[in-house]
């Protein structure tokens, strides 16, 4: 059961940023396990259980990121990630090309929401065709999003607009990838079991 992250979690992430090398990590591996790895896995398990209870007709696939970077893709970075996250999606076979719920913690902040990590061009073309065929469901969602202040629409835009369905839907229509994100500074919620319910 998730009981909250701690100041030690944030301290570990900052220290890792400045000491991103194997000897330092091995010396601090127990700190990683106690303050970041186990709490992240507990939070992911609790959120998964809540989703399974709320939507028993769906199969949820949980992925908790590993701290280790892919050695083939270091590109001058250290061997360890300075942020950790988990994702939950309904279809594991299509990987990052379908939307997922996510939570991420970094040395600076934490975020959660739903969206694409990466979407194929034809996936977004299907999304635009769905908007063209029936804009009302997305119009209702866009209006609800604009009426609240927790989540914002983010994601990379296409260099050239793909069309203009009107001012309300234009930001959605012209995204290369999109997500609805809540980004927060490290606050009391992060250090509390109540984070599970917030997610």
Task: For the regions a language model picked out, list residue spans one by one.
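Short histidine-centered catalytic/ligand-binding loop motif
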Residues: 29-36, 116, 126-131, 191-195
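Structured soluble/peripheral alpha/beta segments that form catalytic or ligand/cofactor-binding pockets
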Residues: 100
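Short, flexible loop/turn elements at secondary-structure junctions
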Residues: 69-71, 90-92, 107, 116, ...
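Compact, glycine/acidic-enriched structural inserts
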Residues: 105-164
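Long, solvent-exposed, polar/charged low-complexity segments
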Residues: 1-15, 38-44, 151-199
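Hydrophobic/aromatic-rich structural module bridging two neighboring secondary-structure elements via a short loop
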Residues: 52-96
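Active-site acidic/histidine clusters and adjacent loop/turn architecture
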Residues: 14-67
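A short, structural micro-pattern
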Residues: 80-82, 97, 106-110, 172-174
